[in-house]
Each structure stands twice: as structure tokens, then as C-alpha cells.
Amino acid sequence: MARVKRGVTSHAKHKKTLEAATGFYGRRKNTIRAAKAAVDRSMQYATRDRRVKKRVFRALWIQRLNAAVRELGLTYSRFIDGLAKAGVEIDRKVLSELAISQPEAFKAIVEQAKSALATAG
């Protein structure tokens, strides 16, 4: 039976790890041991932050909406309540984009929310 040498496999694994560590600082980019630890940690951060990114963007949309709605004389919570009472089902992402790119259309939506609040309350 032929002797099995594993140099090719380990070299490929090491190369893959070092390529993933490109751009890291210090020994983390060129020693296998440090690079492996750094790459493992970076993958943990990446996994965690894919979830965190969703929260961060939602918070950004809410901040933008709050600022835009306050210019038109409402608060964010009253605006969302008014939209619910008016039956408008546009999500926060689209609303924040409207507030930035098409202020006239956004103003019309705010007026809808205001009128729904006036009739309901």
C-alpha cells in the first residue's frame, strides 16, 4: 500500500486561511496560527453582525422618519399610529426613502396620517 503524505492538503488549507486573513494587521496576516484564530473570530463577528445590521438599518429608518415627520408637525409614534388608522401599509424603509427622495409624496402620506388621526381621535 502506498504511503499517504498530507502536505498538499495542509498547504491548501493554510493557503485558504492566509487568503482569508488578507488585510489583517501584524502577524495575523502571515502566520498560520495567528491567522487561523483571527479568521475564526472574524467569521463569528460576520455571523453576529448579519443580524445586527438589520437592527441598525431599522433604527436608521426610524430616525430619518422621525426627523422628517417632526418638520411636518407630528412625532414618529403619532405618525405610525396615523398610518395604521389610515390603512397605509408602507414599510419604514420605503417611507424613509420617500422622505429623502420625494418629499412631496411623503408630505401627502403625512397628511393622510394626520387626517386619520383627526377622524379617529
Swiss-Prot record:
One of its GO terms (biological process) is ribosomal large subunit assembly. It comes from the Bacteria. GO terms for cellular component: ribonucleoprotein complex; ribosome. Pfam families: Ribosomal_L20 (PF00453). GO terms for molecular function: rRNA binding; structural constituent of ribosome. Keywords: Ribonucleoprotein, Ribosomal protein, RNA-binding, rRNA-binding. PROSITE patterns: RIBOSOMAL_L20 (PS00937). Belongs to the bacterial ribosomal protein bL20 family. Binds directly to 23S ribosomal RNA and is necessary for the in vitro assembly process of the 50S ribosomal subunit. It is not involved in the protein synthesizing functions of that subunit. PANTHER family: 39S RIBOSOMAL PROTEIN L20. This is Large ribosomal subunit protein bL20. It comes from Beijerinckia indica subsp. indica (strain ATCC 9039 / DSM 1715 / NCIMB 8712). The gene is rplT.
